[in-house]
C-alpha cells in the first residue's frame, strides 16, 4: 500500500484502511456483566499480576493486542499501524502496552469503542506491499 504524507505529520492513504481483528481484555466486574461472554479474557484480581492500576492497564492493552494479532494470524512486523486508546484518555496505558510490539501507534483519545467500560483494542492493518510477501 502506497502512502504519502501531508504536512509535517499527517498520513494520506491511497486505499482505505480496514479492521482485521479485535480483542477485549477486561476486569472481573465487566466479565460478570450482561456482556461478559463477549470478552476474550478477564483477570480475577483486576491487577493482572501487577502492583499498580497503571501497570495493570498496560498489561491489559498488550494482552488485547497480542490476542488481536493471533486472531488475525499476523505478526507485529506485518502490521503497519496500530490504533488504540484507553480510559485514562492520555494514551499512557496504550503506549505502555504496545511499546514492546514496535508497531507505530496512533493514540485515540476520548475513545468510545463500546458503550460499556472495558478495554477494547482494535488492531488495524493494511495491505502489505507484495515484496514483503504478505497480502492482508
Give the positions of each predicted feature.
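Active-site-proximal alpha-helical scaffold in enzymes
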Residues: 109-135
